[in-house]
Amino acid sequence: MTVQTAQIVKNYIGGEWVESISTKMEAVYNPATGEVIAQVPLSTKVDVEQAVLAANEAFKSWSKTAVPKRARILFKYQQLLVDNWEDLAKLITIENGKSYNEAYGEVLRGIECVEFAAGAPTLMMGKQLPDIATGIESGMYRYPIGVIGGITPFNFPMMVPCWMFPLAIACGNTFVLKPSERTPLLAAKLVELAEEAGLPKGVLNIVNGAHDVVNGLLEHKLVKAISFVGSQPVAEYVYKKGTENLKRVQALAGAKNHSIVLSDANLELATKQIISAAFGSAGERCMAASVVTVQEEIADQLVGRLVEEANKIVIGNGLDEDVFLGPVIRDNHKERTIGYIDSGVEQGATLVRDGREDTAVKGAGYFVGPTIFDHVTQEMKIWQDEIFAPVLSIVRVKSLDEAIEIANESRFANGACIYTDSGASVRQFRETIESGMLGVNVGVPAPMAFFPFSGWKDSFYGDLHANGTDGVEFYTRKKMLTSRWEK
């Protein structure tokens, strides 16, 4: 698959590829080379209006389309994604920067989300009680809610859209997607394949852009719900603005995930899992391992192992076969990350592996090498903030109690992991850690699509999480019918 140089990305509204009303453009870069690969429009509220009206019109017929027919379209869509996985993975690598192997993994996760959505009609069935009183029966029915707005991030340009719009449209809704302006090409490919699968015009729409598009969706009266994934400040804004406009909102936000390594842990396993979780996708994921709390008696061993493995990581263009660590998304994010590394040094942490010194960092792309700090404390910015980069902080503790106490001080609570062979320690961890997704001897405890993606604290704003039965609840509303039938 060839990406056209500096191609102009279009919006997709009412089944047609159309140019934005706006003449303002933003460059889309290949972060591994710094080359401009496309221009994306910064669309206006007028573009949003057109897309919402098209989606609202399509809702009239799509919401009445038989549930099995909706499912058949999604099953065909799933097969098209399978047939095109190589092109999809390559496109993710080109515009996001992650390694081809990681991009392939993301494609698989996206396909899993579509598979779940295709089977979601079985979760849409209502409930009925035939005899709530003599001759009276009562039942609950599920219905779609209308036009949904989806706002997705750059770091998972396939998986996140695929956990949003397939489930929403499976439930009978129509959808307006605002992909990240940094990764619009993959979103366009997803829509092309949905069209090929037979999705009717107007059911799925794309409006590219930034703030104006977000606000247009949040303010439009015909948009009934908003699903968002992104940074904490924007998630909080989306939740407040959306709910002020009487919309149903789920806003998945930032993270600072803690991994606890106890003295009885398998250090070889823990090292392998932490390296992958901390430095995979250049640390640009909300389930990345960013803090490790380790018991003092094994801390030197673990730190030594982590540095040794980090030194083996191949950094470079994700299309190269041996590369594990690709670039961060933009030059300003690279500079921000280097600023955090500088801050860690200034605040007294021990820099045991300096990602600023890797050869690739000096080149044209936006590279930061794997960085590891030891002797980190809670007062440091590198402990407190979501860096969203390949930077790992090590905190030394005396006990599991102390490790859990430290983890619970974080305002973020997406995921947490523990490495141990003790069932009692796992139980204590499960019952006392304040985090929504937990792992035992695994580095990234992200659940499959049939379970909710359930962050806590400042990692999530809303009541119903993405995916699983929560997702079906989010995209549907209930209607109760009570009937009296007498002879």
Swiss-Prot record:
Active site: 286
One Pfam family here: Aldedh
Gene Ontology BP, a term: thymine catabolic process
Keyword Transferase: no
Pathway linked to the protein: Polyol metabolism; myo-inositol degradation into acetyl-CoA; acetyl-CoA from myo-inositol: step 7/7
Source organism, top-level taxon: Bacteria
The EC number(s) this enzyme carries: 1.2.1.27
Annotated NAD(+) binding sites: 154, 178, 181-182, 231, 386
SUPFAM superfamilies per the UniProt record, alphabetical: ALDH-like (SSF53720)
Region forming the signal peptide: none
Record-linked InterPro entries: Ald_DH/histidinol_DH, Ald_DH_C, Ald_DH_CS_CYS, Ald_DH_N, Aldehyde_DH_dom, MeMal-semiAld_DH, MSDH_GmP_bac
Keyword terms: NAD, Oxidoreductase, Plasmid
Catalytic activity, as annotated: 3-oxopropanoate + NAD(+) + CoA + H2O = hydrogencarbonate + acetyl-CoA + NADH + H(+); 2-methyl-3-oxopropanoate + NAD(+) + CoA + H2O = propanoyl-CoA + hydrogencarbonate + NADH + H(+)
GO MF, one annotated term: malonate-semialdehyde dehydrogenase (acetylating) activity
The keyword Oxidoreductase is assigned to this record: yes
UniProt similarity note: Belongs to the aldehyde dehydrogenase family. IolA subfamily.
Subunit structure: Homotetramer.
Known role: Catalyzes the oxidation of malonate semialdehyde (MSA) and methylmalonate semialdehyde (MMSA) into acetyl-CoA and propanoyl-CoA, respectively. Is involved in a myo-inositol catabolic pathway. Bicarbonate, and not CO2, is the end-product of the enzymatic reaction.
Protein's name according to its UniProt entry: Malonate-semialdehyde dehydrogenase 3
